């Protein structure tokens, strides 16, 4: 931020809005790269959107009726059926937890992405001037720590179900003897399979982060480069297009999760 009485430049405005409220910024850890440098705003808004998801679905579940459903119940039922159909078409194992997991991921990621449509200064301005909070980023999925944490969670489930379904020996055999089933090719197979395995969570998390971070940067540029009375001319068309991006990214994250877990449930001899 600029010093008191000093005008904030466009570059300063952009840098400020791309900065997280972290323990380092509050002087609670000594380094910005410290493992303990938690991004408080990203955690808060990820929890906030998660609670919204739980609240909506809990409310609908309690008020579900066999009669004429309300608009909210219809919307929730459409989402549930949409996710269930995709799981049925994509997941070929037997696991009753996959559909609820896919539903949670789709709705949670979608709600985190939707925060990108909140006007740039709508929450940061009152937070800074009324509450004394110097930095506030409201889009959790534009924080690589959040997206990679979710991707690593999916990765942990992949490893867990691979070992559970195939056995530790079967999982090791899959890494060592595929794609070339010959002892001399084991080092080459391991190199290919381990890189492929590690690339899954990396691409899963970075894809979501990259798309949402880029969208956030465009909104910030519109706010920084245009006078307030013209900002809508840049932000509105991008917001309309971004609605599609928000939905697609949530869908892609969900579908890749289903695909990866389906692969983990496949028999090693498949």
From Swiss-Prot:
Family: Belongs to the ATPase A chain family.
Any one of the GO CC terms: proton-transporting ATP synthase complex
Alphabetical list of NCBIfam families matching this protein: ATP_synt_6_or_A, PRK05815.1-1
Keywords associated with the record: ATP synthesis, Cell inner membrane, Cell membrane, CF(0), Hydrogen ion transport, Ion transport, Membrane, Transmembrane, Transmembrane helix, Transport
GO MF term list: proton-transporting ATP synthase activity, rotational mechanism
Subunit note: F-type ATPases have 2 components, CF(1) - the catalytic core - and CF(0) - the membrane proton channel. CF(1) has five subunits: alpha(3), beta(3), gamma(1), delta(1), epsilon(1). CF(0) has three main subunits: a(1), b(2) and c(9-12). The alpha and beta chains form an alternating ring which encloses part of the gamma chain. CF(1) is attached to CF(0) by a central stalk formed by the gamma and epsilon chains, while a peripheral stalk is formed by the delta and b chains.
Keyword Phosphoprotein: no
Protein topology in the membrane: Multi-pass membrane protein
Protein name: ATP synthase subunit a
Subcellular location: Cell inner membrane
InterPro entries: ATP_syn_F0_a_bact/chloroplast, ATP_synth_F0_asu, ATP_synth_F0_asu_AS, F0_ATP_A_sf
Species of the source: Vibrio parahaemolyticus serotype O3:K6 (strain RIMD 2210633)
Functional description taken from the UniProt entry: Key component of the proton channel; it plays a direct role in the translocation of protons across the membrane.
Record bears the keyword rRNA-binding: no
Gene: atpB
Transmembrane segments: 38-58, 98-118, 143-163, 208-228, 239-259
Pfam families named among the record's database cross-references: ATP-synt_A
